Amino acid sequence: PGMPGPYRAYTECKNRGIFPMAKIAIMGFGTVGSGVLEVCRRNAASIARRAGEPVEVKYILDVRDFSGSPDAALFTKSIDTILNDPEIKVVVETIGGTKFAYPYVRQCLESGRSVCTSNKEMVATYGAELLALAKEHSAAFLFEASVGGGTPIITPMHQCLAANHISSIRGIVNGTTNFMLTKMKRENMGFDEALKIAQQLGYAETKDPGDDVDGRDACRKIAILASLACGHHVYPDNIPTRGIRDITVADIKAAEKLDSAIKLIAWYNEGGDGQMAAG
């Protein structure tokens, strides 16, 4: 049992196993990448116990200058450093986006290295292709953290619910907009003020919060879940998407009068004719 079609490869990746391992590389050293390094060090003993041997971060790929960092010796600006080292069997991708992450992940998988990522844009756009590539080269392409953050949903879908037919998915998958809508409702706050607070707290991007407030983040997440549910790649560009940018306090009050609340809901439905819809 497991996922049908190309997304069965995700189950095969999980079952193939990538442990035990000794040395890994991190691609990208922003908030997520630095967090991965911190967790690897802080939880080194428990990771070693579960993996069967110690896990060490040998390289960090980032084009910026970290010469003043205590970990300066780990940094490289070239993907070739990772690809030319036979000790590196697992790569953690935290670059984000697709411009650099996608070709780098392709090269890692083609070289037989397993990749773990939380990059929802890359998974939503190229997931089926990268899963097939991983299978071809006996590697694993794992993306549990791309939806739900620390809340497991992908593994339960393809393992715990392997005997079930998933015909519908519906839920709140973007925490930033949920935080903003809650603020707007409880504190009678306008959109701009709620967004400013979300940005100050680090929930929303300061320069361009569009991924959250315009619904693109939620769109990518439901594309991933829909793909796993139906076994075929669902492209985010084919999913009608609307965010919360136009929601006003008046809208929220009108919903309250109907004993309702405004939420950004991502959904997937399978029709009786075998067709599917998502939004």
PLM features: residue spans?
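Short, low-complexity intrinsically disordered segments enriched in A/P/G/S/L with frequent Arg
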Residues: 5-12
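Structural motif
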Residues: 27, 93-95, 118, 125, ...
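Predominant activation on well-ordered alpha-helical scaffold segments within soluble catalytic domains
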Residues: 33, 37-41, 131, 154-158, ...
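Rossmann-like NAD(P)H-binding beta-loop-alpha module
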Residues: 88, 135-217
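Rossmann-fold NAD(P)-binding glycine/threonine-rich loop
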Residues: 101-111, 120-149, 154-158
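Substrate-binding/catalytic subdomain of NAD(P)-dependent oxidoreductase enzymes
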Residues: 194-279
